[in-house]
């Protein structure tokens, strides 16, 4: 997929008619900047009509449970909603964050899987409770374009944040690290372990400096605790990434980033920051996924 995405980025002009007469429906249960605009742009580059709905504020509240007596606040069941949307759209893209209340429920990805189960058209994940694959593909493209050796060392490090954030981005980045090969490491304080099925085989450090040793790429990201799930256990500013810690490595972050909390100004304003390259590649990761769907 990585080679295909990079090739399409270089030469996508020929694909401008592939999506003609097709409609991409984008449903947002949560806020978005990069995902929303890059996926819209990708659809348009393929000639698709793009319709966007902020489902959280504009749609009916959806029920996802089977056999529920719907006498509460939820007005429509996913069965009807997904079936109706499938009549209007040839591809449906969905963004729905983790609620960070119940780990098993978030890992079950109820909203995304509800659409997968009841829609009659392909579904694109624009960040779900458990993962953000469009971001991970853009990240892989960015690493491939900027690596200085065949098997660079890739490190994922936790950094502090005042709010509880989902584990979706780190989950997908870890899956991508496993596929890239080469040396890897993950650094986080105690209590912040990611899904052990995803991190299997990757060295885990509670000492950030040790993990960052000889790193080529440092991916900085906050996520909330695993035990107790969804909590903010630690806001230790010494975990913030600055140029001293980064050394000669290149820094990555999915954005939005809180300056001087997660990453210092001196890093974000330096040539070692790849965040704008990552954001640019968001268009091309979405383009590749939509291109694959339209071709098949």
Name the predicted role of every residue range.
Residues 198-273:
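Rossmann-like adenosine-cofactor binding region
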Residues 119-121, 182, 244-250:
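A short helix->loop->beta-strand "cap" motif at the edges of active sites that frequently abuts
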Residues 29-51, 144-220:
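Glycine-rich phosphate/diphosphate-binding loop of Rossmann-like nucleotide-binding domains
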Residues 18-24, 151-153, 248:
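Phosphate-coordination loops involved in phosphoryl transfer and adenosine-cofactor binding
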């Amino acid at each position: 997929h990585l080679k295909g995405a990079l090739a399409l980025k270089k030469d996508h002009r020929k694909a401008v008619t592939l999506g003609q007469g097709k409609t991409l429906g984008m449903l947002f249960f949560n806020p978005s900047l990069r995902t929303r605009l890059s996926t819209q742009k990708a659809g348009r580059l393929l000639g698709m009509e793009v319709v966007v709905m902020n489902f959280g504020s504009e749609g009916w509240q959806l029920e996802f449970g089977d056999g529920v007596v719907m006498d509460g606040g939820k007005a429509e069941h996913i069965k009807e909603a997904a079936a109706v949307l499938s009549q209007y759209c040839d591809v449906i893209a969905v963004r729905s964050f983790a609620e960070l209340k119940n780990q098993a429920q978030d890992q079950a990805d109820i909203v995304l899987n509800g659409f997968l189960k009841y829609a009659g058209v392909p579904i694109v994940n624009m960040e779900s409770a458990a993962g953000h694959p469009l971001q991970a593909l853009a990240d892989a493209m960015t690493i491939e374009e900027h690596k200085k050796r065949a098997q660079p060392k890739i490190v994922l490090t936790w950094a502090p944040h005042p709010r509880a954030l989902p584990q979706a981005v780190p989950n997908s980045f870890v899956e991508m690290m496993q596929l890239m090969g080469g040396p890897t490491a993950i650094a986080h304080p105690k209590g912040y372990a990611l899904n052990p099925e995803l991190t299997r085989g990757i060295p885990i450090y509670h000492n950030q400096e040790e993990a960052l040793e000889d790193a080529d790429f440092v991916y900085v990201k906050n996520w909330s605790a695993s035990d107790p799930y969804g909590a903010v256990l630690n806001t230790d500013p010494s975990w913030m990434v600055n140029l001293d810690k980064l050394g000669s490595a290149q820094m990555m972050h999915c954005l939005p980033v809180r300056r001087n909390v997660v990453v210092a100004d001196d890093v974000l304003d330096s040539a070692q920051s790849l965040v704008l390259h990552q954001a640019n590649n968001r268009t091309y990761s979405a383009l590749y996924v939509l291109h694959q769907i339209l071709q098949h």
